Amino acid sequence: MLQIKSIPAFDDNYIWLIQNRDRDCAVVDPGSAEPVLAYLKQHDLNLKAVLITHHHHDHIGGVAELVHQFPEIHVVGPAQEPIPTLTHPVEDGDQIELFDERFMVLGLPGHTLGHIGYVGDGKLFCGDVLFSAGCGRVFEGTMEQMFSSLNKLLSLPEETQVYSAHEYTAANVAFALAVEPENEQLHIYRDEVSRLRAQNQPTLPTTLGREKWVNPFLRTQEPSVIRSVASQVSTLDPLTIFTALREWKNEF
C-alpha cells in the first residue's frame, strides 16, 4: 500500500506525493518545485517520477526545475498536450508501473483536450476533472466531453479514494447546497468540511461513494437536482442538466 501526502502550493493547489516503504516517491502535478524540494529534504525522500494530468502552468510549472535537480526521473504525462519535459507520454488505456503498483491511465478530456487521470492501488489522481462536490471548468473541451469523463469515473469502485488537485471543497459544497438545499448528506458534509478547514486540514481525499451523495455534477438524474435547473432548460436529459449546472456554477 502506497502512502499519499499532500504538499500545498499557491493558494489552493495540492501536489500529491506518492511514497513507498523504501523512501522512494513520485509527485503528481508539481506546479512549483520549491515546496516539493523542501518536502523531499525534510523527509529524506528520493524522487523517482513525476505524473502530470494536464498542461496548465499551475500543474507543470515546477517540472523543469525538478528535472534539473533530478535528471534521471521519469516524467509521465498526456501525449496529446504540449508538455516539453515528458519522458513517458501516455494516453487512455495505457498502464504504468509505480513502486510495484500498476496504475491505469484514463483519458478525461473536458477541462483540457488531453487531460488524463491515473487510477491504481485504490486511488484516483484526477487533476482538475473531479473535485469534491464539484467538477472542473470546461476550458478546451466540450460539455459533452466533461460529462463523459465524469461518467467514466463513476464506473470505478465506490471506495476509490479521490485525490483532486485543488482545495475547492468549501465553495463547492456551498454551490451544491444551492442546488439541493434539502440534501441531508450535504449538510453533514458541510459541517465536516468546515471543521477540517478551521484546523487547516485538507478535505481530500474524498471517495467516489461519498461524491455520489454530495456532488451535483454526478447526480444529474436525481429529481432534486433536475428541479433546480428545470426552469432554465428545454429538455431534462442528463447532459442538458449537467450543462445547466456547470454554467450556473461558472457564475456562482
Swiss-Prot record:
HAMAP family: Glyoxalase_2 (MF_01374). It comes from Vibrio cholerae serotype O1 (strain ATCC 39315 / El Tor Inaba N16961). Pathway: Secondary metabolite metabolism; methylglyoxal degradation; (R)-lactate from methylglyoxal: step 2/2. The keyword ATP-binding does not apply. This is Hydroxyacylglutathione hydrolase. GO terms for biological process: methylglyoxal catabolic process to D-lactate via S-lactoyl-glutathione. Binds 2 Zn(2+) ions per subunit. Zn(2+) 2 binds at residues 58-59, 128, 166. NCBIfam families: GSH_gloB. Monomer. The keyword Metal-binding applies. Its EC number is 3.1.2.6. Keywords: Hydrolase, Metal-binding, Zinc. Its cofactor is Zn(2+). InterPro entries: Clx_II_MBL (IPR035680), Glyoxalase_II_hydrolase (IPR050110), HAGH_C (IPR032282), Hydroxyacylglutathione_Hdrlase (IPR017782), Metallo-B-lactamas (IPR001279), RibonucZ/Hydroxyglut_hydro (IPR036866). The gene is gloB.
